[in-house]
Each structure stands twice: as C-alpha cells, then as structure tokens.
A protein has these predicted regions:
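C-terminal structural segments of small proteins and small subunits
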Residues: 73-106
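A generic "binding-loop/recognition-motif" signal
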Residues: 24, 34, 45, 54, ...
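N-terminal first-folded block
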Residues: 5-47
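Conserved acetyl-CoA-binding loop-helix of GNAT-fold acetyltransferases
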Residues: 60-71
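A short, internal acetyl-CoA/4′-phosphopantetheine-binding micro-motif in the GNAT/acyltransferase core
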Residues: 52-59
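A short alpha-helix capping/helix-coil boundary motif
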Residues: 49-51, 68-69
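Short, Lys/Arg-enriched N-terminal segments with co-localized hydrophobic residues
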Residues: 1-3
Length: 106
C-alpha cells in the first residue's frame, strides 16, 4: 500500500526525519530507516490512538513528539475527533492545549 502523506523535519540531533501516514498508523524514519510508529483506529468520526513506540536506541531525540504532533495535525485536518488511549498522546495534548477541544474520551 502506498503511503498517504509524508512530512519531513529534523530531530534533536539534527538528523533528517520523515513521518509517513499509512492505513492504520503513522511511521517515523530517521535517515530513511523506520524507527517508530503510532497506531490508530478510525471509528465513527473519531481516531483512537492506542499505542506509540520508538525503538529504544532512538529514545531521547524527540521522535515520539514529532510523530504525535504530525498524527494529531493530520487527524485535525481530516475533521476527526481524537481519542488518546496512549499515554504519550495524552501527555502531548496536556502540553499542547490547542488540541484539547478535539479530544473525546474512550
């Protein structure tokens, strides 16, 4: 399945990162290597985020934050509500209240 969309930026080390939207998940790659993902389930106008994961050797570089930000921006652009089951997503929303109006609790 071809990727739906991509966004490019850099992590805290300056390494190039790419977030790719795919059916059921967004992935993040560093220098072209996929190192993390955030799963989602679209259901009745809501996008449920149950899990975020970044490979441990890539921890501390801000990759999960980049991944969550891109996923939430794409969700907002799609007109869907956010259900933050994953603690990473909940924590990000707590620090970025601009997403709070879009949140539905599970």
């Amino acid at each position: 399945v071809a990727p739906m969309a991509t966004a490019s930026t850099t992590d805290k080390t300056g390494a190039p990162t790419t977030v790719t939207a795919e059916p059921g998940r967004f992935t993040i790659a560093v220098d072209g290597k996929t190192v993390g993902l955030i799963d989602y389930i679209d259901q009745g106008g809501r996008r449920i985020f149950p899990h975020t994961e970044v490979q441990p050797e890539y921890g501390g570089r801000g990759l999960a934050t980049i991944l969550v930000a891109e996923a939430l921006d794409a969700t907002r652009a799609a007109g869907l509500r956010i259900v933050p089951e994953c603690s990473m997503v909940s924590g990000y929303i707590a620090k970025h209240p601009e997403y709070a109006p879009l949140v539905d609790r599970a």
